[in-house]
A protein has these predicted regions:
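Bulky hydrophobic segments
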Residues: 1-107, 112, 119-145
Length: 145
């Protein structure tokens, strides 16, 4: 199995795990019971999001790496992740404003917190991918060395 397929499989497992934990958290009120549970979930969501972005842009990521351009890779990953997470936060505000749903508790400070911890998680996920690429020597294969 190639690395792209492994990344997708890990993404699917992590997404399913996150779904289960979130379902349990809502049922048992963990978001209200544990002070930093929301931060932990957004960090985990960032890792999951990074795995998805790595799978989606796999060839582009390898191209960045084959040109030894880590800075552009991290910037690209972070901007794409922030765009997706930002749209999610806009959706939360919209749903709360339009439908009067109050359990989302959308507010600017929470949104900033969500974006920060999600982005940190996405950087951890990207770092995992970079270490995997390095351990499998995929860069040499890309360069033809």
């Amino acid at each position: 199995m190639n690395l792209r397929a492994k990344v997708f499989r890990r993404f699917a497992y992590l997404l399913f795990g996150l779904f289960i934990v979130n379902t349990l958290a809502n049922y048992f009120y963990w978001y209200q019971s544990f002070t930093n549970f929301d931060r932990l979930m957004h960090f985990a969501g960032g890792v999951v999001g990074s795995f998805f972005l790595t799978w989606l842009f796999y060839e582009k990521y390898l191209k960045f790496l084959s040109h030894r351009n880590l800075k552009k890779l991290f910037i690209f990953n972070t901007l794409i992740f922030l765009a997706a997470a930002g749209l999610w936060e806009v959706m939360e505000f919209s749903v709360q404003g339009i439908f009067g749903v109050d359990h989302l508790l959308a507010n600017p400070m929470d949104s900033v917190d969500d974006l920060v911890f999600g982005t940190l998680g996405s950087l951890v996920g990207l770092t995992y991918f970079l270490n995997k690429v390095r351990s499998l020597n995929l860069i040499k294969k890309q360069n033809g060395n």
